[in-house]
């Protein structure tokens, strides 16, 4: 059987971690691409040399030319500048938009049939621009955000309730930024909703509100502690879970930055919503009922994303 090919555009901390996790899971052969000569080759070799110890059979190689991604089944994009302490994701828009233009052209030429996962910030605007630049079908281009934000929310809740993260479910909608919308009503511990757990005395609404804010600040918290970089383990794990759902056709119900064409009353915008993710890419966008408070927060988040997309158009008018 021919193994799947997974191309990683960007070989920084997330790219290297992606390659390692993909190797351990034996999801496919890996091409690490980066414009920095030697970096992708060195990381590919280092990970490959760990394979006899960890017992995985995956071919890894590094490259500095887009030709190397030719025919890739999955492309995961991390290329661009990462946040530093004190920066918001939105501060990266100008420089990373130029990167997306180059990456989109490379994907369009060499991997037009791939399923593309974008991680580059500001996420929702960058995946929107990447889809435009690449010309790939909207259901084959997604952004990694909701899974990561939901994972952070789930972890913080598991710590609050002192239970296994496996028994905590959570949904975070909207843009991947300060306006993200953690949905308390749809978040559960062992099937019991958070509002019911508050009524049962397991926690207080004040604590839930604090956890929601910590979730919104999750990336910034990691950055402030690291001081010299941004999160990479959790973002990489999130993206690999998306790639795995596509490659194995598992039809996972997960929150991703997906293209909306009327769903939730939103058009021509990528924003975090629950979807069915399978071998067809985004096979279905799930529209859940939102109460007025949730709807207002979601609309506010969508408008924040739209403003970023408008800023992209101001820089590159052809995106319109």
Curated annotation (Swiss-Prot):
GO annotation (BP), single: tricarboxylic acid cycle
The gene coding this protein: mdh
Protein source organism: Bartonella tribocorum (strain CIP 105476 / IBS 506)
EC numbers, comma separated: 1.1.1.37
Signal peptide stretch: none
Pfam name, any one: Ldh_1_N
NCBIfam families (UniProt xref): MalateDH_bact, PRK06223.1
Residues involved in NAD(+) binding: 10-15, 34, 96, 119-121
Protein known as: Malate dehydrogenase
UniProt family annotation: Belongs to the LDH/MDH superfamily. MDH type 3 family.
Residues noted as binding substrate in the record, renumbered to the chain: 83, 89, 121, 152
A GO molecular function held by the record: L-malate dehydrogenase (NAD+) activity
EC main group: oxidoreductase
Functional summary from the UniProt entry: Catalyzes the reversible oxidation of malate to oxaloacetate.
Alphabetical keyword list: NAD, Oxidoreductase, Tricarboxylic acid cycle
Active site: 176 (proton acceptor)
InterPro entries: L-lactate/malate_DH, Lactate/malate_DH_C, Lactate/malate_DH_N, Lactate_DH/Glyco_Ohase_4_C, Malate_DH_type3, NAD(P)-bd_dom_sf
Catalysis: reaction(s): (S)-malate + NAD(+) = oxaloacetate + NADH + H(+)
UniProt keyword annotation of NAD present: yes
């Amino acid at each position: 059987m021919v193994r799947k090919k997974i191309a990683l555009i960007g070989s920084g901390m997330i790219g290297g971690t992606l390659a390692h996790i993909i190797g351990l899971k034996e999801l496919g052969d890996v091409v690490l691409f980066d414009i920095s000569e030697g970096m992708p080759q060195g990381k590919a070799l280092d990970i490959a040399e760990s394979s006899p110890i960890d017992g995985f059979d995956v071919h890894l190689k590094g490259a500095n030319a887009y030709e190397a991604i030719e025919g890739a089944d999955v492309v995961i994009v991390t290329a661009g500048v990462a946040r530093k302490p004190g920066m918001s994701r939105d501060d990266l828009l100008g420089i990373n938009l130029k990167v997306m233009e180059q990456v989109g052209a490379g994907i369009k030429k060499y991997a037009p049939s791939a399923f593309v996962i974008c991680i580059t910030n500001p996420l929702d605007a960058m995946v929107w621009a990447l889809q435009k630049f690449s010309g790939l079908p909207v259901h084959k281009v997604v952004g990694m955000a909701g899974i990561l934000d939901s994972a952070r929310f789930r972890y913080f809740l598991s710590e609050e309730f002192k239970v296994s993260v496996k028994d905590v479910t959570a949904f975070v909608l909207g843009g991947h930024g300060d306006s993200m919308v953690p949905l308390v009503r749809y978040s559960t511990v062992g099937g019991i909703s958070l509002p019911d757990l508050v009524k049962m005395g397991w926690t207080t609404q004040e604590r839930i509100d604090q956890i929601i804010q910590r979730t919104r600040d999750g990336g910034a918290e990691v950055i402030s502690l690291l001081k010299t970089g941004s999160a990479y383990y959790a973002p990489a794990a999130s993206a690999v879970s998306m790639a795995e759902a596509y490659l194995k056709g598992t039809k996972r119900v997960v929150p991703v930055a997906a293209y909306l064409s009327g769903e939730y009353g939103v058009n021509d915008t990528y924003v975090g919503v629950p979807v069915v993710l399978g071998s067809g890419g985004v096979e279905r966008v799930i529209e859940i009922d939102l109460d007025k408070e949730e709807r207002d927060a979601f609309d506010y988040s969508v408008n924040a994303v739209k403003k970023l997309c408008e800023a992209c158009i101001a820089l590159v008018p052809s995106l319109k």
